[in-house]
Amino acid sequence: MAVDFVATEELVIAARRNLSQNVWDYLTGGAESETTMRRNRLGFDNLALRPRVLVDVSTIDAGTTFLGHRLRIPVMLAPIGSLQTLTPEGGVAVAKAAEQFGTINFVSSVTQPSLEEIAAASSSPKVFQLYVHGDMKWVESIIARVKKAGYHAFCLTVDTAYYGRRERQTMDRWLPPARRTPPDPRYQASLTWETMDAIKEMAGLPFILKGVATAEDAAIAVEHEVDVIYISNHGGRQLDHGRGTIDMLPEIVAAAGGRAEIILDGGILRGTDVLKAIALGAKAVAIGKLQGWALAAAGQAGLVRALELLENEIITAMGLLGVTRLDQLSPAYVCPAQPVAPAHEMSAFVRIPGGRLT
C-alpha cells in the first residue's frame, strides 16, 4: 500500500525499480551537463532557515489559495509530458490524486489520455498547459476544446523555442511518445510577445506564463497583464548552465511588483524547499520529478502519499520556524548558507543507495 512509504525517498527507490532505463532517464535527467538541473537543488541548499522561538504553534494552517481556489498545501502538480510512460492511467491518475488530496494539477498538451478525458476524471480545478505545435487556427481549436472541457486556467510554456539536448535520452536512442512524431519546430521558435497576447486574448481564462527566468521578462509580462508568472527552467531540461529557479525568484518578485502571482518549479523535493520559496515571495510551487517518481512508484496512491509526506514536512518545519500561517513567512526567515553536500537531483535524500540512482 502507498501508505507504507514513510519518506519520499522510498518513492524514488520504488520508481527506479519499476521503470525501464529509458523512461527513468527521461524523467530524471536534464540537458547536456545537467548543470542547470543541479543548480535547482544547489539554490535551495544555498539557503538556511532562521527560526523564531517562543511562539504558540499549537495550530498550524499550511493552506493557501491560487487563482481563487483553495490548496491544502502550497504545492501543485506541474505539467509533465508522456505521463502514460510512468503509470498506465497517465494524466487521469494525476487528476484523481489532485482531487483526492486537495490541490491543482497542470495538464500538459503532450500527455495522454486526451485533455477531455483528464478533465472528466475529477471535478477539481485544473490548468491546461500548451506547447504551440501549430498555427493560430490550430491554437484556436485547442483552446475551444480546453474551454469546453471546463479547465479553470490556461498556461503557455515559452522556454522551448528549441528542444533541449537531453543527452541521457540521446544516448539511450529513445524518445518519449510525444517526440516520436516531431512537431513542426517553427511554431515554438517563432513565438513573440505579440503571439502571446493573441493566445491570451483567445483563451479568455486566467493566464499563466511558464518559463520566465529574468526580471526583465517578468517586467514585460506584467505590462502584458499576465495573471501568473511561472518561474521555470523546465527542470533543467532546456538551457544548460542556467540559474536555479529559487535564485531567480527574488528579482522576479521585485520586477512583478505585486501585479501578478508568482509560482515556481525546479528542484523541489522537501517541505523546507517549499517554505523557502514562499518566504522569498512565491505564492505556491509545483513539483515535477517528485510527482513523476511518486506516480512510477504507486500510481495515484503514490502521488497522494508524496503530497501527504510533503504536508507533514511543511507543517513540522512551520512549527519549528515559529509560524502558523504561510503569510507570516518573509525573507527574514532565510539567509545565505554553504551547502553541505554536492548538489544533484537526489541530494535532498539521505538513504538513496549509493547516494544517487542512475
Give residue ranges: language-model regions.
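Glycine-rich active-site/cofactor-binding loop and its immediate structural neighborhood
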Residues: 71-117
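An N-cap/entry alpha-helix motif that binds or orients negatively charged groups
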Residues: 1-71, 166, 175-191, 328-329, ...
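Internal helix-turn-beta structural module
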Residues: 300-328, 334-340
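Outer-membrane beta-barrel proteins
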Residues: 129-133
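A compact, surface-exposed functional segment
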Residues: 276-304, 336, 340, 353-358
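Alpha/beta enzyme core
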Residues: 82, 96, 117-121, 134-264, ...
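C-terminal helical cap(s) of enzyme catalytic domains, especially alpha/beta-barrels
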Residues: 40, 171, 241-254, 295-315
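Short, conserved beta-strand segments within well-ordered enzyme catalytic domains
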Residues: 48, 54, 63-65, 74-78, ...
